[in-house]
């Protein structure tokens, strides 16, 4: 489905004005309360934006916030759109497109994910170092140009974030994030396959945003909140309620980490551009 991105962007631009956006943040399932940690300048409901799809998932309210923190402006998306809701890939990446149109310096993408690795448990935070989406490359081909010979994850930026986490005494794991199309959770057999492939966590979002951002020279930091064990790891039945409950438990350290990142990113920017 083709989208007139400029038409989508215009009402948001009118609402937010001519501001310089430092960081764009996409909040995953159960992590929407983070926006309360920032000074909210103004906001717009996605229902008031031309052709903006409506998220149908609990915990994704569908609002875009202009926030101020640490003497900078940030745009925060509370409400993600997923492919499994029936939307096109061009709709799913709308928050990333808008972030780029605002000339954001960085994109922080967050998600709730199921833990596969024995090193991960619910309430852990994982910095995404690599991606696994073998079966979806054809679907995502329009997001990543073959002429851009670079890896989507910036190792130096990830190392910077990891060092920040140690300074504020937050345990941040690192690992490989696998994409699953949803809407159903993965089967135990699929999880065993992903484990053999050295994947650490699995979820139903994030990779489209990372690919679009990388292809459009928008540096990305991607963080998973491990909200449950993946299917077959334990005998517990998976549910969205478990996802949101665990995200609520982890929100204090999650908020501290994200606030620290957006505060310290100018230091990385100055270092990497000198």
Segments predicted by a language model, with ranges:
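Zn-dependent metallopeptidase/amidohydrolase metal-coordination segment
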Residues: 204-242
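Generic non-transmembrane alpha-helical segments
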Residues: 11, 15, 156, 160-171, ...
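Metal-dependent peptidase/peptidase-like ectodomains
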Residues: 140-180
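His/Asp/Glu-rich mid-to-C-terminal helical/loop segments that flank catalytic regions of hydrolases
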Residues: 231-274
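Short acidic/polar active-site loop segments enriched in Thr and Asp
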Residues: 105-106, 200, 219
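Active-site/ligand-binding-proximal alpha/beta "capping" segment
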Residues: 164-200, 266
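Non-catalytic positions within long, well-ordered alpha-helices that form the structural scaffold/packing
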Residues: 99-103, 195, 214
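Metabolite-binding pocket within alpha/beta catalytic cores that recognizes anionic/polar moieties
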Residues: 1-149
């Amino acid at each position: 489905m083709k989208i007139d991105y400029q038409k989508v962007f215009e009402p948001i631009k009118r609402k937010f004005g001519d501001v310089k956006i430092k960081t764009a943040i996409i909040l995953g399932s159960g992590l929407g309360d983070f926006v309360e940690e920032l000074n909210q300048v103004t906001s717009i409901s996605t229902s008031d934006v031309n052709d903006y799809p409506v998220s149908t998932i609990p915990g994704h309210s569908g609002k875009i916030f202009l926030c101020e923190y640490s003497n900078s402006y940030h745009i925060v998306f509370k409400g993600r759109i997923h492919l499994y809701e029936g939307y096109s890939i061009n709709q799913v990446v709308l928050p990333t497109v808008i972030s780029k149109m605002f000339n954001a310096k960085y994109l922080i993408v967050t998600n709730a994910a199921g833990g596969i690795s024995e090193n991960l448990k619910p309430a852990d935070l994982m910095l995404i170092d690599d991606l696994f989406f073998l079966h979806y490359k054809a679907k995502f081909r329009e997001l990543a140009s073959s002429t851009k010979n670079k890896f989507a994850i910036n190792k130096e930026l990830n190392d910077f974030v990891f060092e920040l986490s140690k300074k504020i005494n937050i345990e941040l794991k690192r690992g490989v994030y696998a994409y699953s199309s949803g809407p159903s959770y993965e089967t135990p057999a699929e999880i065993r396959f992903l484990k053999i492939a050295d994947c650490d966590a699995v979820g139903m979002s994030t990779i489209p945003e990372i690919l679009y951002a990388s292809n459009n020279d928008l540096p990305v930091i991607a963080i998973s909140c491990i909200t449950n064990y993946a299917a077959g790891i334990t005998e517990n039945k998976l549910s969205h309620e478990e996802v949101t409950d665990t995200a609520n438990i982890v929100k204090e350290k999650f908020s501290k980490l994200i606030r620290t990142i957006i505060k310290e990113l100018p230091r990385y920017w100055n270092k990497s551009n000198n």
